[in-house]
Amino acid sequence: QHSTDYDEEEEDRAKLHLDAR
């Protein structure tokens, strides 16, 4: 279990991309 700012940002970006679709 490892959570880093980068990981969180990546998830946020992925969500944004899905929303953009």
From Swiss-Prot:
Query: What spans are recorded as compositionally biased (Basic and acidic residues)?
Result: 12-21
Q: Which residues carry this modification: Pyrrolidone carboxylic acid?
A: Q1
Post-translational modification remark: Conversion of fibrinogen to fibrin is triggered by thrombin, which cleaves fibrinopeptides A and B from alpha and beta chains, and thus exposes the N-terminal polymerization sites responsible for the formation of the soft clot.
- Name the predominant localization: secreted
Give the coiled coil ranges. none
Q: Which domain of life is it from?
A: Eukaryota
The answer to whether the entry has keyword Coiled coil is: yes
GO annotation, cellular component aspect: extracellular region
Give me the glycosylation sites of this protein.
T4
In which residue ranges is the amino acid composition biased (Acidic residues)? Answer: 1-11
**Record localization:** Secreted
- Spell out which residues are annotated as carrying Sulfotyrosine: Y6
Ranges for the region named Disordered are 1-21
List GO BP terms, alphabetically.
Answer: adaptive immune response; blood coagulation; innate immune response
**What does the domain comment read?**
A long coiled coil structure formed by 3 polypeptide chains connects the central nodule to the C-terminal domains (distal nodules). The long C-terminal ends of the alpha chains fold back, contributing a fourth strand to the coiled coil structure.
The UniProt function text for this chain reads: Cleaved by the protease thrombin to yield monomers which, together with fibrinogen alpha (FGA) and fibrinogen gamma (FGG), polymerize to form an insoluble fibrin matrix. Fibrin has a major function in hemostasis as one of the primary components of blood clots. In addition, functions during the early stages of wound repair to stabilize the lesion and guide cell migration during re-epithelialization. Was originally thought to be essential for platelet aggregation, based on in vitro studies using anticoagulated blood.
Q: How does it assemble?
A: Heterohexamer; disulfide linked. Contains 2 sets of 3 non-identical chains (alpha, beta and gamma). The 2 heterotrimers are in head to head conformation with the N-termini in a small central domain.
Q: Could you tell me what this protein is called?
A: Fibrinogen beta chain
Q: Which organism is it from?
A: Cervus elaphus (Red deer)
